[in-house]
Amino acid sequence: KHQGFKQMITLEQAWQAVHLVPDPEIPVISVTDLGIVREIQIKGEVVHIALTPTYSGCPATQEIQRDVEKALLSAGASSVEMELRLSPAWTTDWINPEAKEKLKRYGMATPSKCASPAAEQVIRFVPTLKENLNCPLCNSNKTERISEFGSTACKALYRCLSCREPFEFFKPI
């Protein structure tokens, strides 16, 4: 819990402030685009925010918490309480459609649907895909996986056989 100057902030202002916080590992999308901001409530002078990390060991979680808190305090919150919600587990289905388009323009492929139904599930970082991935650069479906892990555990590295460019794939979780 962080205490700051006593100012009032509306729920709409809180959501707007948090929407401006970029994901530290994929800065072209915000933490709200990614779907990890699960809830914001204002109770008195305290902004309560619930975040669900992309996975429980995500190394960016603390940085995201700091950035979200800073954004809320800058927007006029006088106090912020953060909750990490690990259940239900985050799924790539929570990435909003606009963010998927931003990721494609950034050169990253996203799954069309979750690997398994949203419920209690085992998170697997090795993709078991039954679909051909389209290259986010040229849209060819002639692609191959180079590595099961990309720059982070939740991404895999692929290469397009048509344009020969490498790209990352956000694994279905």
Which residues does each predicted region cover?
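Domain-level signature for proteins that mediate thiol-based redox and metal-cofactor handling
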Residues: G4-I173
